[in-house]
Amino acid sequence: MKEVGIVGYGSDLPKYRIKAEDIAGAWGKDAQAIKRGLVVNEKSVPGPDEDTATISVQAARRALSRAGINPKDIGAVYVGSESHPYAVKPTSGIVAEACGVSPDFTAADLEFACKAGTAGMQMCMGLVGSEMMEYAMAVGADTAQGAPGDALEYTAAAGGAAYIIGAKKEEFIAKFNGTYSYTTDTPDFWRREHEHYPKHGGRFTGEPAYFKHVLNGAKGMMAKMDTTAKDYDYCVFHQPNGKFYISAAKQLGFTEEQYKYGLLTPYLGNTYSGAVPLGLSNILDHAKADDRIFVVSYGSGAGSDAFDITVSDRISEVVDKEITTEKLLESKKYVDYAVYLKYRGKIRM
């Protein structure tokens, strides 16, 4: 299989935020205890005109801008999410049409809880690496929901990032050295048809779910590449909250200097399918040539996708072609709990 790499990337976040204090205050909870326990201070809130499709389109357009390619050369578009706006109507078709991708392409909406975006990246790697097409695009985005008063309400957020995969080395922003996946049937988090909000296994979502899959996915990737944490400059993991992320990083031997740019949850919340793609985009915004990045996603149900990536010298040419993830994080407007309920459609008669 041919070597493949990232030739374009872009991210998008809603402007609105709500602080943990506002959510806790509405339910008579101790905000400081919640912030300490989750390592989450605030989260993004999509506006009434924002959904997974609009976020995906914006991220994809920014990825195209950085790639500098003709969108009609893209042969596949995949959008991974657990909050597609339609039960029957593909988000991927909306994204492709809005970005000017030719009708001569394949598309699909993907679901695997929070790792649907990285699953799409793997599919793109295979299609481009096998020379079935010149370029392929994968998007991971969500506008996640948590039931009012549930622990998820402090973290379930919105955002996403897009990646264009190609095989021309001179176009690489970063090269994929390898990928590895670890998957089981673990029912830690679920939502049935017609239910408004997901259910979760509480403490069961930790050791037998998140940590089992992230750590085994990471160890499998390192064994495949014959590496340790010391071989990487940066790392990013799925981040349902800041506490799990930091614990996983430290258990694998990574330092704060290595994991800090990938950790967005304290300021953004959990963007589900967008979490690892967004963390990776922020790392790329700060990286330099030859930096090596370790990536592990996680999706409830459950599985992890891991990647070993090396940044190319082209990164310095493309970062400033579009708004960075850090600037999107800094551009924000706070809303109170009442506005949050209205924007998220949580007021039901």
Swiss-Prot record:
Keywords, alphabetical: Acyltransferase, Isoprene biosynthesis, Transferase
Gene3D superfamilies xrefs: 3.40.47.10
Annotated (3S)-3-hydroxy-3-methylglutaryl-CoA binding sites: 30-31, 114, 155, 205, 238, 270, 300
GO MF annotation, one: hydroxymethylglutaryl-CoA synthase activity
UniProt GO BP: farnesyl diphosphate biosynthetic process, mevalonate pathway; isopentenyl diphosphate biosynthetic process, mevalonate pathway
Amino acids binding CoA: 203, 243
EC number: 2.3.3.10
EC class (word): transferase
Pathway noted in the entry: Metabolic intermediate biosynthesis; (R)-mevalonate biosynthesis; (R)-mevalonate from acetyl-CoA: step 2/3
Active-site residues, Swiss-Prot/TrEMBL: 82, 114, 238
Pfam families: ACP_syn_III_C
Catalytic activity: acetoacetyl-CoA + acetyl-CoA + H2O = (3S)-3-hydroxy-3-methylglutaryl-CoA + CoA + H(+)
Functional summary from the UniProt entry: Catalyzes the condensation of acetyl-CoA with acetoacetyl-CoA to form 3-hydroxy-3-methylglutaryl-CoA (HMG-CoA). Functions in the mevalonate (MVA) pathway leading to isopentenyl diphosphate (IPP), a key precursor for the biosynthesis of isoprenoid compounds that are building blocks of archaeal membrane lipids.
Subunit architecture: Interacts with acetoacetyl-CoA thiolase that catalyzes the precedent step in the pathway and with a DUF35 protein. The acetoacetyl-CoA thiolase/HMG-CoA synthase complex channels the intermediate via a fused CoA-binding site, which allows for efficient coupling of the endergonic thiolase reaction with the exergonic HMGCS reaction.
Family of this protein: Belongs to the thiolase-like superfamily. Archaeal HMG-CoA synthase family.
HAMAP family hit by this protein: HMG_CoA_synth_arch
Protein name: Hydroxymethylglutaryl-CoA synthase
Organism expressing this protein natively: Methanococcus maripaludis (strain C5 / ATCC BAA-1333)
